[in-house]
């Protein structure tokens, strides 16, 4: 049996230090994971994310009585060690959804651009009012749905803003991770974002408890 890529979190009483330690652990585990992938491995994971993610978004749209051509979805453009979500965003666009990707501003603010716009023209934070599904990055998530991010505070700022702007309808937030990155507990503060579900290549979309 192969060893787990991430250990069980053992709190030390210093959440700031614990977060720094865990971010280092997750980043190292990601490098180890993707360094071992062949091109076929990466393609298989990308396809799994695309199929499962698209199906889940389609089902969400159907429950809301909407076609995908009326949906706006936030996503992200992954770095090398992040889950390969490019095929998913492409599939969403091909199905008619509008896909927004973040533009990093001064901490902790994000602007947004339409992925279909090659110039990535900023649309302003108010565009979040149009979002129907939020697919977001992260480093790990607890079984309770507490997200560990990169440390910039961008999504801890953005998600409350999203929920305020879409208060009349519940916008689901799904973090996209590698298969090993759901753990019993992560180091967390009260302000850390809580998500509704996780999308992974091996499991598809799985709801997380509160």
Give a label for each model feature.
Residues 1-22, 28-35, 40, 125-134, ...:
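Surface-exposed, charge/polar-rich loops and edge strands
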Residues 77, 138, 202:
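Glycine-rich, N-terminal phosphate-binding loop of Rossmann-like dinucleotide-binding domains
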Residues 79-81, 139-143:
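Short glycine-rich anion-binding loops that position phosphate/pyrophosphate groups of nucleotides
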């Amino acid at each position: 049996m192969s060893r787990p890529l991430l250990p069980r979190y053992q709190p030390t009483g210093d959440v700031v230090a614990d977060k720094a330690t865990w971010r280092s652990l997750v980043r190292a585990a990601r490098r180890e994971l993707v360094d071992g992938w062949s091109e076929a491995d990466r393609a298989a994971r990308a396809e799994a994310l695309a199929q499962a993610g698209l199906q889940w978004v389609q089902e969400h749209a159907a429950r809301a009585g909407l076609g995908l051509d009326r949906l706006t979805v936030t996503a992200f453009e992954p770095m090398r060690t992040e889950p390969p979500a490019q095929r998913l965003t492409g599939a969403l666009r091909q199905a008619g959804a509008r896909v927004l990707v973040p533009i990093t501003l001064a901490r902790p603010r994000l602007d947004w651009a339409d992925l279909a716009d090659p110039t990535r023209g900023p649309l302003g934070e108010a565009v979040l009012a149009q979002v129907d599904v939020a697919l977001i990055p992260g480093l790990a998530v607890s079984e309770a749905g507490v997200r560990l991010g990169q440390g910039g505070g961008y999504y801890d700022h953005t998600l409350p803003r999203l929920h305020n702007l879409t208060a009349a309808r519940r916008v689901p937030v799904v973090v996209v991770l590698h298969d090993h990155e759901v753990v019993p507990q992560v180091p967390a503060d009260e302000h850390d974002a809580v998500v509704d579900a996780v999308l992974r290549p091996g499991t598809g979309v799985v709801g997380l408890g509160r």
